[in-house]
Design a protein with these regions (language model features):
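Aromatic-residue-lined binding/catalytic grooves and analogous aromatic/hydrophobic interfacial grooves
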Residues: 5-22
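Flexible, solvent-exposed loop/hinge segments and secondary-structure transition points
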Residues: 14, 23, 30-151, 158, ...
Length: 202
């Protein structure tokens, strides 16, 4: 029977080898490949212009003024989490409300009313569902082309632009289906708003 004394050195050697192999070499190679081939994705898909960071293209930002495009409802809780200086931090979480609950129905109704008031020219058009519901993450950066089109008249008027100019920006910020067949077309709200502000080129 092998003693513990004879087994431990071998076990320790195997542990060190696999730690070096998978903890250092493997992760280093994968990180290097990612930085070489997909540097933007590997570094968080941050939108940066002239050295200033404006956000991540994969995380939604909340816009409420008439001159910008509105995204999906965001679930934000800053009541509990603060940094060392007491500044509130933003955290998002999926909604736990049932679609059949009265509270959820009230939230949807309030959102519809707000959109109707902001976009009176679209009074006869049904409000796209993604403008009045939360996403699973609570921070979805995209909306449907229909939801973007619903806001064109308001955005054009607020920015003294033509509706076709706004549609051109939306088209430039629209992602197609994956491989042309999977998923749906989506519009990145942050990119649209940065183009409206003249920060990103059209």
């Amino acid at each position: 029977m092998k003693t513990m004394k004879s087994v431990l050195p071998k076990a320790g050697m195997i542990f060190l080898i696999f730690t070096l192999l998978y903890g250092v070499i493997y992760t280093g190679v994968v990180t290097g490949i990612a930085q070489l081939i997909f540097p933007d994705n590997a570094n968080g898909s941050i939108i940066e212009v002239d050295g200033k960071k404006y956000g991540c293209e994969l995380l939604g930002q909340q816009y409420t003024d008439e001159a910008h495009m509105w995204g999906r409802i965001m679930n934000i809780d800053v009541s509990t989490y603060t940094d060392e200086n007491g500044k509130a931090l933003m955290y998002a979480a999926p909604s736990n409300l049932s679609p059949a609950s009265e509270e959820y129905a009230q939230l949807v109704a309030e959102r519809v009313e707000k959109l109707r008031a902001a976009d009176p020219d679209m009074d006869e058009t049904a409000v796209p569902v993604d403008l009045v519901t939360c996403s699973g993450s609570g921070l979805d950066p995209h909306i449907s082309p229909a939801a973007a089109e619903y806001q064109v008249a308001r955005i054009a008027k607020a920015n003294d632009m033509t509706e076709d100019e706004v549609r051109e920006i939306i088209q430039n910020c629209t992602d197609g289906r994956f491989l042309g067949i999977f998923g749906e077309e989506t519009v990145n709200v942050l990119e649209v708003n940065l183009m409206l502000d003249g920060i990103l080129e059209k």
